[in-house]
């Protein structure tokens, strides 16, 4: 029986980074919300979302949202101040 234990949770988002430093973050859909996913961990849907929406070649499902590593410099990821509010939040 598989169980997912989350001892502590933290919200990770990108506001800015040093020049040359790799940028990571949650993929954002057309509604400006994070892209939801399941199952956790390695996830083909997240790999696709990260490639198409963040210019990243590595993504996985973390806390039920697609998280992308080493995204392109021009990519807008969740938490970016220029993004605006998620349109599905009411």
From Swiss-Prot:
<dbReference type="GO" id="GO:0090729">
    <property type="term" value="F:toxin activity"/>
</dbReference>
<feature type="domain" description="LCN-type CS-alpha/beta">
    <location>
        <begin position="23"/>
        <end position="87"/>
    </location>
</feature>
<keyword id="KW-0964">Secreted</keyword>
<keyword id="KW-0738">Voltage-gated sodium channel impairing toxin</keyword>
<keyword id="KW-0800">Toxin</keyword>
<dbReference type="Pfam" id="PF00537">
    <property type="entry name" value="Toxin_3"/>
</dbReference>
<comment type="similarity">
    <text>Belongs to the long (4 C-C) scorpion toxin superfamily. Sodium channel inhibitor family.</text>
</comment>
<keyword id="KW-1015">Disulfide bond</keyword>
<feature type="disulfide bond">
    <location>
        <begin position="46"/>
        <end position="66"/>
    </location>
</feature>
<feature type="disulfide bond">
    <location>
        <begin position="33"/>
        <end position="86"/>
    </location>
</feature>
<keyword id="KW-0872">Ion channel impairing toxin</keyword>
<dbReference type="GO" id="GO:0005576">
    <property type="term" value="C:extracellular region"/>
</dbReference>
<dbReference type="GO" id="GO:0006952">
    <property type="term" value="P:defense response"/>
</dbReference>
<feature type="signal peptide">
    <location>
        <begin position="1"/>
        <end position="22"/>
    </location>
</feature>
<keyword id="KW-0528">Neurotoxin</keyword>
<comment type="function">
    <text>Putative sodium channel toxin.</text>
</comment>
<dbReference type="GO" id="GO:0019871">
    <property type="term" value="F:sodium channel inhibitor activity"/>
</dbReference>
<dbReference type="InterPro" id="IPR044062">
    <property type="entry name" value="LCN-type_CS_alpha_beta_dom"/>
</dbReference>
<protein>
    <recommendedName>
        <fullName>Putative sodium channel toxin Ts35</fullName>
    </recommendedName>
</protein>
<dbReference type="InterPro" id="IPR003614">
    <property type="entry name" value="Scorpion_toxin-like"/>
</dbReference>
<dbReference type="InterPro" id="IPR002061">
    <property type="entry name" value="Scorpion_toxinL/defensin"/>
</dbReference>
<feature type="disulfide bond">
    <location>
        <begin position="37"/>
        <end position="61"/>
    </location>
</feature>
<dbReference type="InterPro" id="IPR036574">
    <property type="entry name" value="Scorpion_toxin-like_sf"/>
</dbReference>
<feature type="disulfide bond">
    <location>
        <begin position="50"/>
        <end position="68"/>
    </location>
</feature>
<keyword id="KW-0732">Signal</keyword>
